[in-house]
């Protein structure tokens, strides 16, 4: 049994993971959906990391899954606790000394989104419409629930440089979604390659994939966990 530690995207709480958590528990795993102080203007990335470490407690066999802006917190958690695996899901891959606020300009994000809008023939209004960019795979009732459970996101953790000088010593994989309209997949492929030196895994789905495809996401996470953790773990006998 593994313990999946789920670190949410910006402006999200444990509810975001509820469908995925059910899938993982059905497979026999423990799940910690971290409740970050995202609306607290006094809280920075160190406070986010503290919240995750407290939630983990004395659990072991950790698989840390950090989505989107959560990718700034996931490696910090793995610097504090021993994790068997870190999975960055549709991630804002951080770089040493770069603040999350600087990430957008430093990665060429705006140009990638503009190129996507031109390919898709979207108007500027469509490119800013959450129903087009985020919720295009979700049924109306789930969109309503997602909107009702959204949280305010403080700008404080975006202001200070990411503190790690080097990536933590943890097996790391990136999982991208080919239908992601917020972080276009070609943009993330290059970012993951440039910053982590790895080839990402991919699956179908849009950015809020834990809501739109929880079963498929659980399957992919389990495939990655088995590849990394069970192969690396020596067999008795």
Regions found by a protein language model. Name each.
Residues 65-70, 74:
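Gly/Ala-rich beta-loop-alpha elbow adjacent to hydrolase catalytic centers
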Residues 168, 174-176:
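Short beta-strand/loop motif that positions the catalytic acidic residue
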Residues 2-41:
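Conserved HGGG/HGGXW glycine-rich cap/lid loop of the alpha/beta-hydrolase fold
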Residues 178-204, 211, 223-225:
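Conserved loop-alpha-helix segment in the C-terminal half of the alpha/beta-hydrolase fold
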Residues 79-120, 124-127, 154-161, 184:
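Flexible "cap/lid" loop of the alpha/beta hydrolase fold
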Residues 48, 211-227:
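Post-His helix in hydrolase/transferase enzymes
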């Amino acid at each position: 049994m593994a313990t999946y530690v789920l670190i949410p995207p910006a402006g999200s709480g444990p509810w975001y993971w509820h469908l995925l958590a059910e899938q993982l528990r059905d497979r026999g795993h423990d799940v910690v959906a971290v409740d970050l102080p995202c609306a607290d203007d006094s809280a920075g990335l160190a406070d986010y990391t503290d919240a995750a470490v407290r939630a983990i407690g004395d659990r072991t066999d950790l698989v840390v899954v950090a989505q989107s802006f959560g990718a700034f917190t996931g490696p910090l958690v793995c610097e504090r606790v021993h994790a068997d695996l870190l999975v960055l899901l549709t991630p804002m891959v951080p770089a040493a000394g770069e603040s999350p606020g600087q990430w957008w300009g430093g990665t060429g994000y705006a140009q990638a989104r503009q190129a996507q809008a031109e390919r898709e023939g979207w108007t500027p209004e469509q490119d800013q419409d959450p129903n087009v960019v985020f919720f295009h795979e979700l049924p109306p009732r789930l969109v309503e629930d997602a909107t009702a459970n959204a949280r305010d996101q403080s700008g404080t953790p975006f202001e200070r440089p990411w503190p790690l000088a080097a990536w933590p010593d943890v097996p790391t994989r990136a999982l991208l979604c080919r239908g992601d309209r917020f972080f276009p997949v070609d943009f993330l492929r290059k970012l993951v390659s440039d910053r982590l030196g790895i080839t990402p895994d991919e699956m179908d789905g849009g950015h809020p994939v834990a809501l739109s495809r929880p079963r498929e996401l659980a399957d992919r996470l389990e495939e990655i966990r088995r590849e990394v953790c069970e192969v690396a773990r020596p067999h008795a006998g």
